[in-house]
Each structure stands twice: as structure tokens, then as C-alpha cells.
Amino acid sequence: MAAEASESGPALHELMREAEISLLECKVCFEKFGHRQQRRPRNLSCGHVVCLACVAALAHPRTLALECPFCRRACRGCDTSDCLPVLHLIELLGSALRQSPAAHRAAPSAPGALTCHHTFGGWGTLVNPTGLALCPKTGRVVVVHDGRRRVKIFDSGGGCAHQFGEKGDAAQDIRYPVDVTITNDCHVVVTDAGDRSIKVFDFFGQIKLVIGGQFSLPWGVETTPQNGIVVTDAEAGSLHLLDVDFAEGVLRRTERLQAHLCNPRGVAVSWLTGAIAVLEHPLALGTGVCSTRVKVFSSSMQLVGQVDTFGLSLYFPSKITASAVTFDHQGNVIVADTSGPAILCLGKPEEFPVPKPMVTHGLSHPVALTFTKENSLLVLDTASHSIKVYKVDWG
């Protein structure tokens, strides 16, 4: 019995933490719900729940009209009501939640662990974001999302510095952005699944080049150390290298690096070794279930390592569903897992795989990730419409 109790302790703590993140937090401002007036959970007429402070911020000052930030249904601030189930849950879990900070202080993060130091974005600032990139010169963060202007640029502090890329059907507009990368000379490259093209902008949002008619469904995009562009074609099952004169807005050459890939989506390039990682989404025959597979190629495009959902299940008790891939500064392959959700290190390609969890808390649905020059990890969480900045805690 004592053994069962000791085993259930971590599981119970994990359940409490998950409840606190998923149920007891306002998904607009990310503050914890509580009994204080500004933090009280309020039901909107559509059934979604936000805190009273966000209701006040969203409502028109005279008419009190507002739109639900999640489903856009119209309602009025005066028609909201306390969400009693959430308030009751706070009371039921109150003692355990009050003990949680003390428990965290008693067991601090191990030296070298990644901890979330900063979050920016949020619903309204970002809407269903899909791609993330970091400018190598300015350090600014570029995100593509489903807002009226599809490309949003943030400064290092998380403030919105600029946005462009109108939603529309014109050649220079962006219909459905999937991924984004920044070239070494600060050009913004976006894959647009809406018209199956690749669009190149300067850093101020002026269109420089539209590459259309060559891809069935362009998806992942990344910059190489030589300032080339690699792009996956999910429908054609191929990987391409584009040589572009960005200053003149001219496509010089297109080279197909790989064919016969299975629904390739995410792609990453190691600036240390030149290796290329591709994230595939093969469909299991007869099941309709989509798994994921990470393939790593050398700079000469020789396959040096691969691992799929089944292979990772030999290391972890739960299913791993990779949604994004990148390299760290040491050449390790890093993936985002939406089933966990978590961030995992798979090790170096020649040792593939040596999986190790890096981030296991505080994520909802990570879809993109990248490292800064200072070795901070940026994670794009589409469920919370935000960018989360993780740094190494040396204790």
C-alpha cells in the first residue's frame, strides 16, 4: 500500500499541474483564475471562460459589446456571469495548489534545466500561429498566423515592431501561411498553401518575389548557411533547394534534393554541420492513423539517421507525435511533441536516437521552435497563441 501511495504521488502532482494549466488559467492573459474580483472566471454567452479583467478590456466602453476572443460570437460584458464550476474547482484544489509553490521551492530545477522565463503574444496579438523564425542580424522574432496581416515581427522584448502581408487573393497577399524563415540578409520567406507558392518580402514588408507553379504544396521552409532556401513539398513528397538573388528578386536555380519522401512538412538545417532534418507524416496503411518520422541527411544528402513514432515509443511510455524539428548549437536534433506535450532532444544524427526530455511542463500544442544566439529556446504554442522563451537555469 505504501509503495502504491508513493507511486501515485508524482502522478497526482502531474494531474494537479495539468489542471492548473488547462482549466484554472485565463487563456487570454494567462493569469490564474481566483476569487479576487479581477481574476474571477466569467462565462461568456458562447460558453467560453475568461477572467473579469479581460472582459473589461475587451468590452466597448459605452455599449459593453464584445466578441469572444476564441469563437468571435458577439455578447455584452453585462451579460457575463461567474463560472461556478471553475470557482468550485479552485476551492476543491485550493489546498493542493497552495502547497505547489512550496513543493517547487523544496525541489528546485536541476542545474542546466530549461525553464520558461518569458511569454509574449497571446490571443488577438496572434491568431492560430503556424510558423516561427528568428532574424540572424536583428534578433527579432517573426511569426506567421491567421490574422488580417499574416506576418508579425516582434522585438526582443516581445513587443510588436511591425506587421505586413495582407490576407487576400492578390499575388502579393498571403492566403494561408504555413511556415516562415529569415535569410541572412533579412528577407522574409513565407510558404503559402493557399495558392501553393513561396513569397519573398524584404524586412519592411515589400514583396520581392513570388515563386508559383513549381510546387504541389510547399510546406516547411528554412535558410541554409550559404543563404539558400530549402523547402518541403508535402504533396509531391520532395525536398528542394532554391538559389535566389534576394536583392534583385530573381530565382536563379531550383534543385530537387530528395524525392519519395512521405508527406514531408517541417525542415531544419544545422549551421554547425550543414545536416538537414525532415519531418515526415506517413499514413499507416489500413489504419488511417498518421504517425511521424524524423529523417536526418548529411550536407551531401546521405541518410545518416531516422526514427519514427514507434521507435520513440521504445524509449517513452506514451506516444510521441513530432510537430516541429530544429537543431541546437551543438548539432543535436530537437523536436516538439504535441502528444506530451513536450520538447525532446534526440541527440546527434550519428548517435540517433538518444532521446531526452528538455521541456515537459507549460506547453499546450507546440508547432515550431528555434534557438537564439544566446541559446534560449523559442517555442511557438498555437493553442495559447503565444511564444514561450526557455532559458537554461544553472541553479
Swiss-Prot record:
Catalytic activity: S-ubiquitinyl-[E2 ubiquitin-conjugating enzyme]-L-cysteine + [acceptor protein]-L-lysine = [E2 ubiquitin-conjugating enzyme]-L-cysteine + N(6)-ubiquitinyl-[acceptor protein]-L-lysine
Outcome recorded upon mutating L126P: In MELF2; the mutant protein targeted exclusively nucleus as compared to predominantly cytoplasmic and partially nuclear localization of the wild-type protein
Pfam family, one: zf-RING_5
Family matches, as SUPFAM superfamilies: NHL repeat, RING/U-box
Start and end residues, zinc fingers (RING-type): 26-72
Localization of this protein: Endoplasmic reticulum; Nucleus
GO biological process, one term: proteasome-mediated ubiquitin-dependent protein catabolic process
Protein EC: 2.3.2.27
NHL repeats: 113-157, 161-204, 205-245, 248-300, 301-349, 350-393
Tissues where this protein is expressed: Expressed in brain, cerebellum, spinal cord, medulla, heart, liver, skeletal muscle and pancreas.
GO molecular function terms attached to this record: ubiquitin protein ligase activity; ubiquitin-protein transferase activity; zinc ion binding
Entry's Gene Ontology cellular component terms: cytosol; endoplasmic reticulum; nucleoplasm; nucleus; perinuclear region of cytoplasm
Effect of Q302P: In MELF2; loss of interaction with EPM2A
Keywords: Autophagy, Disease variant, Endoplasmic reticulum, Epilepsy, Metal-binding, Neurodegeneration, Nucleus, Repeat, Transferase, Ubl conjugation pathway, Zinc, Zinc-finger
Root EC class: transferase
Record pathway: Protein modification; protein ubiquitination
Disease: Myoclonic epilepsy of Lafora 2: A form of progressive myoclonic epilepsy, a clinically and genetically heterogeneous group of disorders defined by the combination of action and reflex myoclonus, other types of epileptic seizures, and progressive neurodegeneration and neurocognitive impairment. MELF2 is an autosomal recessive, severe form characterized by onset of progressive neurodegeneration between 8 and 18 years of age. Initial features can include headache, myoclonic jerks, generalized seizures, and often visual hallucination.
Record text about domains: The RING domain is essential for ubiquitin E3 ligase activity.
Job of this protein: E3 ubiquitin-protein ligase. Together with the phosphatase EPM2A/laforin, appears to be involved in the clearance of toxic polyglucosan and protein aggregates via multiple pathways. In complex with EPM2A/laforin and HSP70, suppresses the cellular toxicity of misfolded proteins by promoting their degradation through the ubiquitin-proteasome system (UPS). Ubiquitinates the glycogen-targeting protein phosphatase subunits PPP1R3C/PTG and PPP1R3D in a laforin-dependent manner and targets them for proteasome-dependent degradation, thus decreasing glycogen accumulation.
Subunit structure: Interacts with AGL. Interacts (via the NHL repeats) with EPM2A/laforin. Forms a complex with EPM2A/laforin and HSP70. Interacts with PRDM8.
Protein name: E3 ubiquitin-protein ligase NHLRC1
